[in-house]
């Protein structure tokens, strides 16, 4: 009788061994549900951003400040998220993926629950800063977790990471679907933002629980901090891979200790000769898309209120429809065609089409309200299908695991400057120039287009994880 033998176990003695295993093997369960759970912090980020954008004018009235100052206070979450993104790598390296997920979403939950009962504008400011730190920490975690689940060289990894853009618009649509029943149930219009933000805090708690159960710890992190037995357990449970710990050589032990002392670094490497162009491309794509979105997408309900009849109910219904038809659909189509076009070309085409749509809107906005609505929908669609999610996708797929959270956190931090610019400066520009402001806004996607033309880097399918040993060696210097 023949005996069935199990496959030979992998032997691991250094972090690169675990990285290579994860790179070659997708997790056993990488369903769309698991991907969305990993991207859960982005859902909360989108939800709270849209909710506070909706509540901006009500916050100004309730606390006796100007709409411009209210927008500045609300934008404090972006400044805090910028700082949180820069600190994300330290938090992840210190606490690991599992606890860092709890820290990020925990801060967001506390801030959201507290801002819902804010008695004054200073309370709002402090709570928004707390939320921002949490969201800034969470984003690099989320995209890094998806990359680990899929394996960085898998053809599905780019599409999975880029699903965060579709997730963003799903969450934004949920905002309006939450506000509508609250409004119809008799909640005072000026109190809607408080109820909506509190509902967001409940969503954040649910995301925390789901992540704790279904995502867990990172095998790569466990290996980097020397917990090889734990890494073997994670590989067995999540990837169905059998691995055993081999005794490291003395030189590997010394190298590991040196790397651990230097592990908090990494920002300098983002601009060395190998990674400079990758960093610039990811940051510019991310920043320009954030600028154009926060100028158009965040103020969509206010724009539609001037186009459609039906008051606030009509504006909320129209916003939900535009986000669902154009944003969600665009994000889904963008993920499906990503393998064919690649991140750079898809970003380039998206920026070009948004530029054309903005120029058309500047020329034709006053001719027909429904034409304006169609052009706004086109901007949302081409943004979502094109560069909307690809700045972060480029950042996630351009760096090996040791500096991946650093690269994503840095790109996300720089991206926040574009979001702040769109959120604060667009209303000022609109107040002075009205529809002619669209001409000036078209400069933003055009700069993104030029960057994609000039920098020829395509991370999709590149085996960047193989560069991890070299990065660790550079960190030791």
What are these regions (language model features)?
Residues 2-477:
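Transmembrane-helix signature of 12-pass secondary carriers
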């Amino acid at each position: 009788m023949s005996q069935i033998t199990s496959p030979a176990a992998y032997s691991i003695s250094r972090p690169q061994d675990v990285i290579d295993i994860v790179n070659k093997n997708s997790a056993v369960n990488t369903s769309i549900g698991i991907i969305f759970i990993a991207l859960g912090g982005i859902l909360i980020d989108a939800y709270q951003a849209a909710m506070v954008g909706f509540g901006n004018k009500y916050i100004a009235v309730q606390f006796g400040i100007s709409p411009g100052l209210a927008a500045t206070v609300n934008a404090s979450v972006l400044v805090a998220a910028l700082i949180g993104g820069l600190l994300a790598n330290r938090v992840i390296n210190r606490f690991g993926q599992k606890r860092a997920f709890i820290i990020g979403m925990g801060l967001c939950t506390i801030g959201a629950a507290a801002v819902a009962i804010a008695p004054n504008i200073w309370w709002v400011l402090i709570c928004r800063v707390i939320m921002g730190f949490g969201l800034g920490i969470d984003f690099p975690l989320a995209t890094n977790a998806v990359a680990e689940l899929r394996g960085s060289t898998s053809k599905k990894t780019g599409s999975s990471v880029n699903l965060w853009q579709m997730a963003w618009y799903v969450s934004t649509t949920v905002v309006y679907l939450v506000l509508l029943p609250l409004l119809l149930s008799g909640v005072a219009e000026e109190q809607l933002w408080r109820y909506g933000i509190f509902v967001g805090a409940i969503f954040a708690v649910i995301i925390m629980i789901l992540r704790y159960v279904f995502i867990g710890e990172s095998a790569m992190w466990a290996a980097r901090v020397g917990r090889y037995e734990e890494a073997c357990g994670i590989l067995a449970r999540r990837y169905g891979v059998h691995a055993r710990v081999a005794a490291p050589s003395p030189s590997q032990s010394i190298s590991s200790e040196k790397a651990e002392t230097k592990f908090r670094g990494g920002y300098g490497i983002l601009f060395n000769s190998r990674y400079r162009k990758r960093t610039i491309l990811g940051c510019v794509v991310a920043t320009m898309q954030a600028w154009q979105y926060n100028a158009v997408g965040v103020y969509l309900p206010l724009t539609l209120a001037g186009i459609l009849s039906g008051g606030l109910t009509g504006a909320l219904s129209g916003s939900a429809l535009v986000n669902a038809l154009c944003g969600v659909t665009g994000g889904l189509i963008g993920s499906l065609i990503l393998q064919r076009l690649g991140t750079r070309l898809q970003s380039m085409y998206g920026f070009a089409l948004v530029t054309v749509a903005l120029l058309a809107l500047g020329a034709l906005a006053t001719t027909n309200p429904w034409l304006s609505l169609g052009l706004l929908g086109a901007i949302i669609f081409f943004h979502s299908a094109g560069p909307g999610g690809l700045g972060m996708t480029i950042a996630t797929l351009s760096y090996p695991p040791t500096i991946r959270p650093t690269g994503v956190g840095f790109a996300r931090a720089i991206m926040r400057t574009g979001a702040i610019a769109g959120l604060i400066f667009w209303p000022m520009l609109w107040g002075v120039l009205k529809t002619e402001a669209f001409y000036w806004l078209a400069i933003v996607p055009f700069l993104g287009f030029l960057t994609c033309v000039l920098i020829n880097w395509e991370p999709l399918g590149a085996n960047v994880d193989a560069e991890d040993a070299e990065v660790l060696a550079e960190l030791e210097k």
